[in-house]
Amino acid sequence: MKVGVIETHHSHPIIPSVVVQDTSEDPGLIEKGENRFARQWYLPGAFAQYNINNNSNKDEEKKKKKEKKSKSENKKDGERQKNKEKKEKHKNKDKKKGKEEEKKKDIFIIDPAGNMYYNWLFCITMPVMYNWTMIIARACFDELQNDYLAVWFIVDYVSDVIYIADMFVRTRTGYLEQGLLVKEEQKLKEKYKSSLQFKLDFLSIIPTDLLYFKLGLNYPELRINRLLRVARMFEFFQRTETRTNYPNIFRISNLVMYIVIIIHWNACVYYSISKAIGFGADTWVYPNTSHPEFARLTRKYVYSLYWSTLTLTTIGETPPPVRDSEYFFVVVDFLVGVLIFATIVGNVGSMISNMNAARAEFQAKIDAIKQYMHFRNVSKDMEKRVIKWFDYLWTNKKAVDEREVLKYLPDKLRAEIAINVHLETLKKVRIFADCEAGLLVELVLKLQPQVYSPGDYICRKGDIGREMYIIKEGKLAVVADDGVTQFVVLSDGSYFGEISILNIKGSKAGNRRTANIRSIGYSDLFCLSKDDLMEALTEYPDAKAMLEEKGKQILMKDGLLDIEVANLGSDPKDLEEKVAYMEGSMDRLQTKFARLLAEYDAAQQKLKKRLTQIEKILKPVMEQEFLDFEEADPPTDKPGVTKTE
């Protein structure tokens, strides 16, 4: 209960009255000075001096305040959670938008180096070739246009659809930028629109066919703008030339096609001129079509083609021209024939010579060997063996020097080709089975192909082993000293000589061959020399130790290892080899240093000459500027000296 003094309004001695208010219902209304449920009574005067508070009401007020705070806090927490949820929703939406934008950016792109693009080039080449051959023919030969009108309309508009699709394909064809394939749609469209090809493509699909409604259907030359898409045909031929395994044959076929198209166009123009002058008007034009034999469409085209071929190739005789226009046309034909066919025939000749270049070079080697053997009086049997060996190389297409061919490739591609061809073969060798990949790659690049004739000895017993061999193709026999008795026959994938090139200490055979190995027929082998192996092992000391350990184990199994010698310290020969290698390295370094010093001296002399020339040019200029400076600023009087009047 809260007691407050409400009012005093008597003039006589004041007896204050006290109004007792029950504020348990709502303490907030008391603070505002109002209470809907006020219960008031007046207390006698002495109590009017005091405000009376009920403790229970205070506790209730505190509880209610706490409840309000908790409610407000709960509301705030709820709002915070809602805000978080909204933010998360916005983030998810942004992520989805970003993914959608990425999907839009990373649209389906055609790789210009892929098969899909090449196949599309073939598809677009067909309508281009159709337009280049049939539009001119239909325009000149009326029967050809009128008799097959429905067919021409179908093929024309199918080719137009392919033309339009080709423009879409161009907007989806990627291109390389800084070595990466561009896949952004906007960039692809902008690049295509800014190119000359877009303008030509756009002109080639302008619907000039609409003029049919005005001029009639007998004017197929209205579609002449379709010929502007010829660049696609050239691109297809270029890519086919790089893809085919027979490029020379393709080039010749391509040139023949160009010749036929030129003759075809010239024949159509000849028939058109004859029609304009009048059939049978003179001896030069096409004969009169009133004759049934010359009225046939086939005869018209074949006769014109025959005349065009004779004129452009300048072979045979044609009827002489009569009118001025006929003379002019024949002169132009002769000039075109001379220029075009001279170029084409020259190209064909160079292609044929290139096709025979390999054979000519190979034949030159054989001729040189024959002359040498004849000059040195080599026996006929040996001469026959040499010629048979050359014949085997040419017949089996092994006359090409692999190193000469692969030298034009970068080291990385050369290594990949060598790995693809030789790595599996090298892994079959026991001592190289567990070697690291880097060493195997080094060794693969050092394998040298060799071909042996029947009866050739690859190695003889007691020879110093400087190479190891891997059989690629053929059969070798381990024979006795008589060369006839065969102990073992080695076939494809076999190898020998791997221990001798390691020069293992304690080997009872040293680095000598322990058997005679002879080729039974023609054999293809890969050879790895000791020097190449040691050069590769200098960068792989752990691999070298592992190979020597494997070699020792193989020798121990065969009983060819002296363990006491093997357990001794380093061999003096090894130290000598190392010293010799160091001396060679020092010599190479000295040579390089001397070359660098000479280059430095030459560069220093050039700089001195240039400085001298600069001084000569600038010296008079500097002197003139110094004189001008002295004239502009004359010397002043010395300080402390005054002039007397």
Curated annotation (Swiss-Prot):
Residues in compartment: Cytoplasmic: 1-121, 175-199, 243-249, 357-645
Keywords, in A-Z order: cAMP, cAMP-binding, Ion channel, Ion transport, Ligand-gated ion channel, Membrane, Nucleotide-binding, Sensory transduction, Transmembrane, Transmembrane helix, Transport, Vision
Protein's cellular compartments: Membrane
Compositional bias (Basic and acidic residues): 70-86
Main location (coarse class): membrane
Domain of life: Eukaryota
Annotated residues for binding of 3',5'-cyclic GMP: 439-561
Record InterPro entries: CLZ_dom, CNG_cation_channel, cNMP-bd_CS, cNMP-bd_dom, cNMP-bd_dom_sf, Ion_trans_dom, RmlC-like_jellyroll
Region of interest: Disordered: 53-100
GO biological process terms held by the UniProt record: monoatomic cation transmembrane transport; visual perception
Protein's UniProt keywords contain Ribosomal protein: no
GO molecular-function terms, A-Z: cAMP binding; cGMP binding; intracellularly cAMP-activated cation channel activity; intracellularly cGMP-activated cation channel activity; protein-containing complex binding
CDD domains: CAP_ED
Key word Ion transport present: yes
Topology relative to the membrane: Multi-pass membrane protein
Compositionally biased tracts (Basic residues): 87-96
Gene Ontology CC terms: intracellular cyclic nucleotide activated cation channel complex; photoreceptor outer segment membrane; plasma membrane; rod photoreceptor outer segment
Function: Visual signal transduction is mediated by a G-protein coupled cascade using cGMP as second messenger. This protein can be activated by cGMP which leads to an opening of the cation channel and thereby causing a depolarization of rod photoreceptors.
Sequence similarity: Belongs to the cyclic nucleotide-gated cation channel (TC 1.A.1.5) family.
Listed name of the protein: Cyclic nucleotide-gated channel rod photoreceptor subunit alpha
